Structures are given as C-alpha cells and as structure tokens.
Amino acid sequence: MRLRCAVLDDFQDVATTLADWTPVQDRTEVVSFTDHFASEDELASALADFDIVVTLRERVPFPASLLDRLPRLKLLIASGMRNSVIDYAAAERNGVTVCGTKSTSTPPVELTWALLLGLARSLVTESNALRSGGPWQSTVGADLHGRRLGLLGLGKIGSKVAQVGLAFGMEVTAWSHHLTKERADEVGVQLASTKDELLATSDFVSLHLVLSDRTRGILGAPELALLRPTAYLVNTSRAGLVDQDALLAALHEGRIAGAGVDVFDVEPLPADHPMRTAPRLLATPHLGYVSGNNYRTYYGHAVEDIEAYLAGAPVRRLGGSRCATRPGRPPASYTPKTRNPTHLENPR
C-alpha cells in the first residue's frame, strides 16, 4: 500500500506542476489542498489518513495538541530550514521525522523593495486614480537618493536590502542586538548606536530580524512614536516583531507617512480584519517567499526528503527529530523539473 502525502495551503495550485513527483509516485499518493484549514479540529480531521505532510513556511502550526491527534503521521516536511511553529519534542515523542528544504533570500529582498518603492511613489494611489478616471498626478513622491534607510537586522536578507539601498544612493544604517561594527563595515553601512537612534533618524525603516522572545514586539507604541511623521515602515519579516494595534493607531492618526506590510498576526487575514482597510498601508498577502524558483526548490526538495526518508536516511532534519526508519542509502541528487504528473489529486 502506498503512503499518503498531503500538501497544505497550495493556494496557487502549483505544487503538482513546479516539481517532478514521479520519483515517489509508485510509493506515495500525493494530495494537494488549495484551501487553508482554519481550525485545529478541521486540520486534524483532514490529515487523519496521511503518513506525510508538506507545509509551507510557518503557515500552519503543529503543536503537541495536533501532533498527538495524527497517529499515522510519520514525516513532516516544512519549507525552509527554520520553523518556530512546530513542537519538535512532540514530533519526536510521536515518532515523526521533521525535515526542511533549502530556499533563497532573493524573493523577500525584492518584495521589500517593491513595498518601499510603492510607498515612496504612491503607486497604488496613482494607479487606482488613473484606472478609475480620477485626478492626474495627485501625489508627490518621496525621494530615495540621499535619504536614510534604517535596517533592523543585517543578516542574509538585510544585507542584500542594504546593497540595493546603497545602489539608490541612500545612506544606510543598521542595528540589532548583536550587530558589530565589523559586520556593518563589511556590508558597507553605518552602525547605529541604538535602536532608538535608528528609528528617530531614518526616513525608511525595514525589519529583517528573526522572531524570538527577545525580538517579539521590538517595535511597540513607544518605538513607533520615535519615527518621523514623514517616515515609512516596511515589515516583510515576521508579524510578531511589530505591535499590530500600535501600528494601526499610528497609521490612523497620521503619525507616520505609511507602512508596507507582508506579514500578519493571523493568516490568511480575515475579511473584516482592520489591516485590510487601514489608511496609509500597502499590504500584501505574505508574498515574500512566493516566487517560481523558491517554490521549485521547496517542492523539489520535498520530493527529495520523501525519497531519503523511504531510503531510511532522512536529510535536512529539523529540531533533532528522530524516528525508526528502514536502513538504506540516501537517494541520488535530485533536480526539480516542471511537469504535471497525472497521478496527483487536488480535492479542494
């Protein structure tokens, strides 16, 4: 009997076309779900008969309460190599191996700049006015050249955002708890002496931090109050870094020029959520990692993870997960191909 594999939150219905699943089709039945499961009960019911689950990033939490209800689950694959919403101890206790995939940092860098440029030049406002027969040239754009870009975080993504800012002729400064002058010099940016200094002196602020107990809520009402009324804030990192209610208040009261947000406390965002109608907000539905190349990598590596698991030698394991698997050697190197295997299903 073949194992059953569920692919969650395949909103664009592309999991079956952006990777070649034929290496595992004889041993695995793959089912893609294009709708989001809103509750744990719904998710537990839908996944009860699956041995393998593929989930994208941190869209779906896997706490102990859910893992305990999935006795058939043996392999959980999460795209990327870091996931904070999986209870790894519970996975190990339930005999579930957790594996990841590689990814590229380029797409979130590109989206960061799409949001920043969209804000600076009021692209949505101007485009909507043009399409609806509204006023011709109703706004005056904010310049980038010579302005200060403040980055909270200078890791793999933040440093690439910095390079683009420098290419625009911006003055780039950065800060994080562990950022050193040597690292700032290496990237070619200035090191802000404090977080408050960066916020108070920047024309554009962009967040590129890992969400942790230390960084959660790093921008609350007191920090947002430091921003200039002409400043723009961009968050393509994690929703938990910013106090959402404080940001909404700042936008409604006009205390900052605008914000570009790609991540939210609840995803997908409910239809009546206040972030959908907030003024001065350019919002996107968590598109930071959503690109063709990234998805080819995610799903291609998911196939490779399944092959390796079936061979008894799981690869890219996350959280120290362990389970009993048959002995064997890892599969040969796999290169994703674009095709649409006929055996795949999409029930929703």
Please provide the spans of the model-predicted regions.
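An N-terminal-biased, well-structured beta-alpha scaffold segment characteristic
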Residues: 1-99, 104, 200, 220
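Rossmann-like dinucleotide-binding domain for NAD(H)/NADP(H)
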Residues: 98, 216, 230-348
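Glycine-rich Rossmann-fold phosphate-binding loop(s) that bind the pyrophosphate
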Residues: 10, 154-155
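Redox-cofactor binding/interface segments in oxidoreductases and associated redox assembly factors
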Residues: 52-55, 78, 206-207, 235, ...
